[in-house]
């Protein structure tokens, strides 16, 4: 692009010089036709129009003539100039010079020929037409350049050179105007667009909001006194992980009296030091720091004057009276629950929340709400308190268990035979009879139990046998089982149709009774009863061996 541009510019300058010299000769021979015409047109334009229009007309005429010369010369004589280039040698130099001078008159006549409208339309076709013209007619341009170089000595001998001012004017009109416009349109090295970063505004500390003494500074619970964020010491570091924050709004004197010395002086790992700023509010609200003294004074002003002097940025209002406020302060000193402190801050108007939440707290009553929360702890804590602080005495517990066993025995016997309720009661009684203490209660219902054993189904018999097996381990209860009715009912279960589990339980009952008699735990005084008992044992033994 740059090489083609320089080549075209050099060619235009050469053609311009040839045109100037030819034009000077034509002025001498043709009595100066060009300049009078241009001046006449300029004067006519100056009379009818402004000076600006005259200058533009003169520049347009000069441009049209130069371009017409370039176009006509390149189109009409490509072959002649090509031959002149091919035959141009050091020996034939003089001949070509003479032939060039002979054609000078014809060139002058051709130079001023042409139609102005055609030249104007061709000249303003744009860069595309100029580029295609230069590439297609490369050889004719070279021929025209050689011809112009040979015309220079011939015309220079006969013609007078033009002044420097006129040449500079032509240069400004044609060369500089054309190429400067091209350079301006296409910048090879555009400047990058940079982003302007505006500095962040620096907020100055408002001296009016600074507290006068430490009594106006908020005291946070379980932590040393810190300066609130409204004083200007805002945190620039990322927020650290901290436990749930809550505020006990109190003055320095009240907080020093309410907090023990060990709590105030002991450094905590989770608390912040005095030099560390208060963390930002976690909710979508601006923190509003007010002391209890300020809120108390504002409530008194409102009660006396009937106005609302609250000018805090959160635009929340405190709807409590002085009596309710003092009760709330006393409740806050007795607890450190974060939920209760947050509810208190909402009621005091120092924590910005949804209006519905504040309206709910104000309608219910903040004191009533906090008292109910303090009176009803969590279910786990309440259950633990019942077990640890109010344990029942041994006699009371034993009495309740005896009542429960009697109640279960009555209900079990009252249910229909083989009913689910009866079977559930037998299962519970089997669990209760694992302890010998309650055997004397169940022994009162032996007749009903042996009736169920003889008339119940397989599952009912299984539950009754488990209960009797537990009772047979106790010598006192086993003594009550040694009678003809009970032993006859036990002997009936030993048959081929009985379940194996029931047979095992029946054998275990007889073994327990035999062991009690052998050890002397059970003494049989009546020989008739003893003989009957031994006969039943032999019969049961034979049945078991047969099975």
Curated annotation (Swiss-Prot):
It is found in: Cytoplasm; Nucleus. Residues 1-10 have a biased composition (Basic residues). It comes from the Eukaryota. GO terms for biological process: learning or memory; negative regulation of neuron apoptotic process; positive regulation of dendritic spine morphogenesis; positive regulation of neurogenesis; positive regulation of synapse assembly. GO terms for cellular component: cytosol; extracellular exosome; nucleus. InterPro entries: ARM-like (IPR011989), ARM-rpt_dom (IPR006911), ARM-type_fold (IPR016024), GASP1-3 (IPR043374). Pfam families: Arm_2. Transmembrane segments: none annotated. Highly expressed in brain. Not expressed in lung or liver. Down-regulated in brain from patients suffering from Alzheimer disease. Residues 1-32, 80-102 are annotated as: Disordered. Its main location: cytoplasm. Induction: Down-regulated in colon cancer cells, due to CpG hypermethylation of its promoter. One of its GO terms (molecular function) is protein homodimerization activity. Keywords: Cytoplasm, Nucleus. Belongs to the GPRASP family. Homodimer. Survival and differentiation promoting protein that plays a role in the regulation of neurosynaptogenesis. Induces phosphatase PP2A activity which results in APP dephosphorylation and inhibits BACE1-mediated processing of APP. This is G protein-coupled receptor associated sorting protein 3. It comes from Homo sapiens. The gene is GPRASP3.
């Amino acid at each position: 692009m740059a090489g083609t541009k320089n080549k075209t510019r050099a060619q235009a300058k050469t053609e311009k010089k040839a045109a100037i010299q030819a034009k000077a000769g034509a002025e001498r021979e043709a009595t100066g036709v060009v300049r009078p015409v241009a001046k006449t047109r300029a004067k006519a334009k100056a009379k009818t129009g402004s000076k600006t229009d005259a200058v533009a007309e003169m520049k347009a005429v000069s441009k049209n003539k130069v371009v017409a010369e370039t176009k006509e010369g390149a189109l009409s004589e490509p072959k002649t100039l090509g031959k002149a280039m091919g035959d141009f040698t050091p020996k034939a130099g003089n001949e070509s010079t003479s032939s060039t001078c002979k054609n000078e008159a014809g060139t002058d006549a051709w130079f001023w020929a042409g139609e102005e409208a055609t030249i104007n339309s061709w000249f303003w076709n744009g860069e595309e037409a100029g580029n295609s013209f230069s590439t297609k007619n490369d050889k004719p341009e070279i021929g025209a350049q050689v011809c112009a170089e040979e015309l220079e000595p011939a015309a220079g001998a006969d013609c007078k050179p033009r002044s420097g001012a006129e040449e500079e004017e032509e240069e400004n009109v044609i060369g500089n105007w054309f190429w400067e416009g091209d350079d301006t349109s296409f910048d090879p090295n555009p400047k990058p667009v940079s982003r302007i970063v505006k500095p962040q505004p620096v907020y100055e500390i408002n001296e009016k909001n600074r507290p006068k003494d430490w009594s106006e500074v908020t005291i946070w619970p379980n932590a040393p006194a810190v300066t609130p964020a409204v004083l200007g010491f805002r945190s620039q570091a990322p927020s650290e992980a901290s436990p749930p924050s809550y505020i006990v709004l109190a003055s320095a004197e009240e907080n020093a009296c309410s907090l023990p010395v060990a709590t105030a002086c002991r450094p905590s790992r989770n608390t912040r030091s005095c030099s560390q700023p208060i963390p930002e509010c976690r909710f979508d609200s601006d923190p509003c720091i007010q002391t209890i003294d300020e809120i108390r004074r504002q409530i008194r002003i409102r009660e006396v004057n009937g106005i609302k002097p609250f000018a805090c940025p959160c635009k929340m209002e405190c709807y409590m009276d002085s009596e309710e406020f003092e009760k709330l302060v006393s409740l806050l000193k007795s607890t450190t629950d974060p939920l209760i402190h947050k509810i208190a801050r909402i009621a005091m108007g120092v924590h910005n929340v949804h209006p519905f939440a504040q309206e709910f707290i104000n309608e219910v009553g903040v004191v009533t709400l906090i008292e109910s929360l303090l009176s009803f702890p969590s279910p786990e804590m309440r259950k633990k308190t019942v077990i640890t602080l109010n344990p029942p005495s041994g006699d009371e517990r034993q009495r309740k268990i005896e009542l429960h066993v009697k109640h279960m025995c009555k209900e079990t016997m009252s249910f229909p035979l083989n009913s689910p309720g009866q079977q559930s009661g037998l299962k519970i009684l089997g669990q209760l009879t694992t302890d010998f203490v309650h055997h004397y209660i169940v022994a009162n219902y032996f007749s009903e139990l042996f009736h169920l054993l003889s008339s119940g189904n397989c599952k009912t018999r299984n539950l009754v046998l488990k209960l009797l097996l537990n009772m047979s381990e106790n010598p006192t209860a086993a003594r009550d089982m040694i009678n003809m009715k009970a032993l006859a009912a036990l002997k009936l279960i030993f048959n081929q149709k009985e379940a194996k589990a029931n047979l095992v339980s029946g054998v275990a009952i007889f073994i327990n009774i035999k062991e009690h008699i052998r050890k002397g735990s059970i003494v049989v005084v009546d020989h008739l009863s003893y003989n009957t008992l031994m006969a039943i044992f032999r019969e049961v033994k034979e049945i078991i061996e047969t099975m």
